[in-house]
Every structure is written in C-alpha cells, then in structure tokens.
Amino acid sequence: LKITLSDCYFSFFLSDNFFENCIMDNMEIPFDIEERLAELFGPEEMALESNRLSSFVSWPYTSEDPCNKENLAKAGFFSDPTASSGNCVKCFFCLKALQDWDRDDNPWDEHLRLTVRKGKSCPFMELGKVEEDLTVGEFFELTKKRLNIVFAKLEEEMQEKLNK
C-alpha cells in the first residue's frame, strides 16, 4: 500500500479541515495526522534565529566554546531537551535531532555530518548562509523545501504505522 500526500498538499492551505479535500480510499488512519502535522511543522517561530537562540535557556557551554548557543542557533538548531538528554537540539528546517554535544563540537560540522550519515540533505545547510545573509527569495525557497520535508516525514510515519 502506497500513500502519497501530494494530492493533499495544497488542500491543507485552502481548507480549515485538512481531510475535507483529501481522499485516502476510505482507510482508517492509524494516528491523528493533523495533530502530528502540527507537531512536525511547529513551532513556526523557530524559523527565526533570534527565537532559536532564546530557546537555549540553560545551555551548558559559554560563548567562548565552539558549541555555544549562538553558533547552534545560526546553524538552524533550537533547544529541544528530552528526558534522557538536556542538550538535545533539533534543526528547524530538516527536523533532525542531535544530542550529547561536547564543548568543542562545531554545530555546522555536526549538522553536515548528520545529514550525510542519514543520507538526506538539509536545505538550510546546503544553502550555507546564516539568517542575516538570506534574501527574501531564499527564505521562501527554504520554507517551501521545509514543507516538503514535513510532508515526507509524515508520509514515512504513516507508512510505518500502516505496514505494522
């Protein structure tokens, strides 16, 4: 069974109810897609570097360390602590999470290493620019690519649930 969300992509933006215009052969959906989509897409405010920076309330490393909160925010990360790791971060653009940082880690290098290891590129890393250097067109292109990543992640999760 193969489900694609491409037919649903634009109806999401044209309708208050994501599923009114999205037909999936009358199948029962194994989880709340709208709720999961909101989780994957948000928090929207983390698109801005200043908001990502403010998410690092109790980051353990100082501004003298390569792995400081300023460098993490510039590299697209925001703080997303888990129960097992207080220094877990997530890239707002590609949704990849990293944890167990050392003070000498370079956020840009680690982000690149993660994307190469996972085999899926991060549009923000590919562009290689910090927020202040982005043009409006580049920002909108990143936003479009981010939406594609969110929908691909949702599709992947649906396939996993349906194949169980």
PLM feature spans:
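Intrinsically disordered, low-complexity linker/tail regions enriched in polar/charged residues
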Residues: 5-164
